[in-house]
């Protein structure tokens, strides 16, 4: 597809049985490359706080940071659908804040949709944002903004009661108007059941192969996050080794006086 993707295109992919590909991006260069590769959706995740800014979790990320990174992504003019995360405290306090901050991500950042975490309890928030004509992608299961309540990054929905609650959450957010939902850190059979029962696309991350699409953090698939690699991450490259080699070679050549040579100098 040579034209810009929309939420309608993403939803049609589920109906057609075509898998949806999603990656995070936080800047211009990565966005340009992944868009040239044909990625379907780009997520400016609040994971930027961890993999880009070095925070321990996503909670410190601010609206201003999200807008900054969204602008950087949008400048690459990707054909992929651009979705921006709503960070912690940008939508939990009241509906007015939620609408205002969703609007900022679209108006000031250039996002085409927003993503927020939570199930049935955020249905009214989703509805309020959608009523402003801003598309919303939901996010249930392991929700990183809830790590203190969950006791860390733990798989959700293993017990029957939890499983039913997540299924109810999925149906509630669909009814509220979400155009898609991220399923994170849940058993693959539960993800399969939710995917079958929803008419909107499910995007899995640590949720098995039966979701309508998959999302991963770009730094994870490139091997740039040496400190922590979840079970569900597959590395498709070793950028850490490539960067280490390039930087080490640069340092060595400068120290030896080999760089710059005449070919990299002006006469």
Curated annotation (Swiss-Prot):
Positions in coiled-coil regions: none
Concerning PANTHER family, the annotation shows: 3-METHYL-2-OXOBUTANOATE HYDROXYMETHYLTRANSFERASE
Q: Which reaction does it catalyse?
A: 3-methyl-2-oxobutanoate + (6R)-5,10-methylene-5,6,7,8-tetrahydrofolate + H2O = 2-dehydropantoate + (6S)-5,6,7,8-tetrahydrofolate
GO CC terms of this entry: cytoplasm
> Any idea of its EC number?
2.1.2.11
Please state what the protein is called: 3-methyl-2-oxobutanoate hydroxymethyltransferase
- State the encoding gene: panB
Quick one: which residues bind Mg(2+)? 46, 85, 117
Source species of the chain: Geobacter metallireducens (strain ATCC 53774 / DSM 7210 / GS-15)
